[in-house]
From Swiss-Prot:
Residues with the Phosphothreonine modification: 202
UniProt-recorded name of the protein: Derlin-1
Subcellular location, record wording: Endoplasmic reticulum membrane
Binding partners and assembly: Homotetramer. The four subunits of the tetramer are arranged in a twofold symmetry. Forms heterooligomers with DERL2 and DERL3; binding to DERL3 is poorer than that between DERL2 and DERL3. Interacts (via SHP-box motif) with VCP. Interacts with AMFR, SELENOS, SEL1L, SELENOK and SYVN1, as well as with SEL1L-SYVN1 and VCP-SELENOS protein complexes; this interaction is weaker than that observed between DERL2 and these complexes. Interacts with NGLY1 and YOD1. Does not bind to EDEM1. Interacts with DNAJB9. Interacts with RNF103. Interacts with HM13.
PANTHER family associated with the record: DER1-LIKE PROTEIN, DERLIN
Gene: DERL1
Membrane-spanning ranges: 16-31, 70-89, 95-115, 123-137, 155-166, 171-189
Role: Functional component of endoplasmic reticulum-associated degradation (ERAD) for misfolded lumenal proteins. Forms homotetramers which encircle a large channel traversing the endoplasmic reticulum (ER) membrane. This allows the retrotranslocation of misfolded proteins from the ER into the cytosol where they are ubiquitinated and degraded by the proteasome. The channel has a lateral gate within the membrane which provides direct access to membrane proteins with no need to reenter the ER lumen first. May mediate the interaction between VCP and the misfolded protein.
Motif stretch (SHP-box): 241-248
Species name: Homo sapiens (Human)
Lumenal-side segments: 32-69, 116-122, 167-170
Length: 251
């Protein structure tokens, strides 16, 4: 048990709370402590009955059962793996910026969920984070199951197909990828590569609550440290090398 506790405490803070909630809320529903009917995102209940908790619970809840358990565990792994890599990599020392990314993606997904009657938001939010990681490491070669190897930029689409095969919904994964693309475009691509204005900015109260842990300028439109280092190493060119690939499942 101490090993599990040490592992859990080693997870970066924001990912740790997200991971814990994604385990706890389905468990509460599975044990019947709270009826799962109160955990879904139902537009009518949220908009007209003022059940304002539903967008939050729908982000963490997943109906775990014999037919969905494997899909849940796979996406829980994706949450742990890629949120940890983003929080300790591109957003290392900048928890406010990372939390703002999650909030921006979450708000976009909630709005889409209300418009499209999507009752579960766990997978879209996880996929949006995975998409951002894949774009920031787009030229990295990753290994998927059965020894397949490809660039990281294709990983979100491979996982979309993989989740569909094991029982997921293409819509959930697609919405997550599109939201992740919107964030990546507004944060990095448009202001940095196309010379456009910054449309996103982390609120100052988040910096006061979660101050950056190292020097430098924080905020959107500023490349993460990993991108700056890669750009310096490549002479400022457009093609980056962000490290070595890894096998999916390796810690």
């Amino acid at each position: 048990m101490s090993d599990i506790g040490d592992w859990f405490r080693s997870i970066p803070a924001i990912t740790r709370y997200w991971f814990a909630a994604t385990v706890a809320v389905p468990l509460v529903g599975k044990l019947g402590l709270i009826s799962p009917a109160y955990l879904f995102l139902w537009p009518e209940a949220f908009l007209y009955r003022f059940q304002i908790w539903r967008p939050i619970t729908a982000t963490f809840y997943f109906p775990v059962g014999p037919g969905t358990g494997f899909l849940y565990l796979v996406n829980l792994y994706f949450l742990y793996q890629y949120s940890t890599r983003l929080e300790t990599g591109a957003f290392d020392g900048r928890p406010a910026d990372y939390l703002f990314m999650l909030l921006f993606n979450w708000i976009c997904i909630v709005i889409t969920g209300l418009a499209m009657d999507m009752q579960l938001l766990m997978i879209p939010l996880i996929m949006s984070v995975l998409y951002v990681w894949a774009q920031l490491n787009r030229d990295m070669i990753v290994s998927f199951w059965f020894g397949t190897r490809f660039k990281a930029c294709y990983l979100p689409w491979v996982i979309l197909g993989f989740n569909y095969i094991i029982g997921g919904s293409v819509i959930n994964e697609l919405i997550g990828n599109l939201v992740g693309h919107l964030y990546f475009f507004l944060m990095f691509r448009y202001p940095m590569d196309l010379g456009g204005r910054n449309f996103l900015s982390t609120p100052q109260f988040l910096y006061r609550w979660l101050p950056s842990r190292r020097g430098g300028v924080s905020g959107f439109g500023v490349p993460p440290a990993s991108m700056r280092r890669a750009a310096d190493q490549n002479g400022g060119g457009g093609r980056h090398n962000w490290g070595q690939g890894f096998r999916l499942g390796d810690q």
